């Protein structure tokens, strides 16, 4: 199936969030599906989801649990380009970091669905030699990968469930800074990225996912389904090249 052509013309129907104030700069028009999205760097944030050793490094939780992360290196490079462009444009960069306390109290016990469905917890129960290794705060698995170290001005928001908005400071952090638009990257497309993006939609944020700056757990069909969900029901879908050309054309 061919990819629909991107329309880059800003019209009265282009979602643009809050009305433009007198004297405010014109928004950047990000080519996207199903229609272009008008964004200001000043009221937008780049959300980098769970770029941790657990999800993107060999020997981390996801690799140890049997998921294919061979495509993660390409995703890492694309996210790094996106972060550089966002910083050039003066856009807020927010890193989400998934995990629990070393005693796993935050993970929930048998009374929590998370205890039963988390593949990290299930893998550790099945392989006792791995107990305490996965997603424990302070451990290597929990750390952000070397290519994604936050810089001054970036924000790191810890989270304990798939959605970055659940029981976290993410919503208040964004609203305090007047953020209305969110640009999503990270791992895994169909789990924490999509969960957080769906909650963003419910909280009245305009959300766009850069499809080539995300990586799924489960195969190409899963990625395709998640992209379909986002562009059809919850937000917009664009690419790293289009984002960089829109916000940091000198580096494109």
Curated annotation (Swiss-Prot):
GO terms for molecular function: hydrolase activity, acting on carbon-nitrogen (but not peptide) bonds, in linear amides. GO terms for biological process: nitrogen utilization; uracil catabolic process. InterPro entries: Isochorismatase-like_dom, Isochorismatase-like_hydrls, Isochorismatase-like_sf, RutB. It comes from the Bacteria. Residues 1-31 are annotated as: Disordered. Belongs to the isochorismatase family. RutB subfamily. HAMAP family: RutB. Hydrolyzes ureidoacrylate to form aminoacrylate and carbamate. The carbamate hydrolyzes spontaneously, thereby releasing one of the nitrogen atoms of the pyrimidine ring as ammonia and one of its carbon atoms as CO2. This is Ureidoacrylate amidohydrolase RutB.
């Amino acid at each position: 199936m061919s990819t629909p052509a991107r329309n880059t013309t800003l019209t009265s129907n282009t979602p643009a969030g809050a009305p433009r104030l007198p004297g405010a700069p014109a928004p950047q028009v990000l080519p996207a599906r199903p229609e272009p999205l008008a964004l200001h760097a000043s009221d937008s944030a780049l959300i980098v989801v769970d770029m941790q050793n657990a999800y993107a490094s060999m020997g981390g939780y996801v690799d140890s649990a049997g998921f294919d992360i061979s495509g993660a290196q390409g995703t890492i490079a694309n996210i790094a380009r996106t972060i550089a462009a966002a910083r050039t444009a003066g856009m807020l960069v927010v890193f989400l970091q998934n995990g629990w306390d070393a005693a796993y109290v935050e993970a929930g016990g048998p009374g929590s669905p998370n205890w039963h469905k988390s593949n990290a917890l299930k893998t550790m129960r099945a392989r006792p030699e791995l107990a305490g290794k996965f997603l424990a705060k302070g451990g290597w698995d929990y750390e952000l990968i070397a290519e994604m170290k936050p810089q001054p001005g970036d924000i790191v928001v810890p989270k304990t469930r798939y959605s970055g908005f659940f029981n976290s400071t993410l919503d208040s952090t964004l609203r305090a800074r007047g953020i209305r638009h969110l640009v999503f990257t990270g791992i895994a497309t169909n789990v924490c990225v999509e969960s957080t993006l769906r909650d963003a939609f419910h909280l009245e944020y305009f959300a766009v996912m850069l499809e080539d700056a995300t990586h799924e757990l489960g195969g190409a069909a899963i990625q395709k389904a998640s992209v379909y969900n986002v562009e059809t029901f919850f937000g917009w879908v664009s690419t790293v090249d289009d984002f960089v050309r829109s916000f940091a054309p000198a580096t494109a």
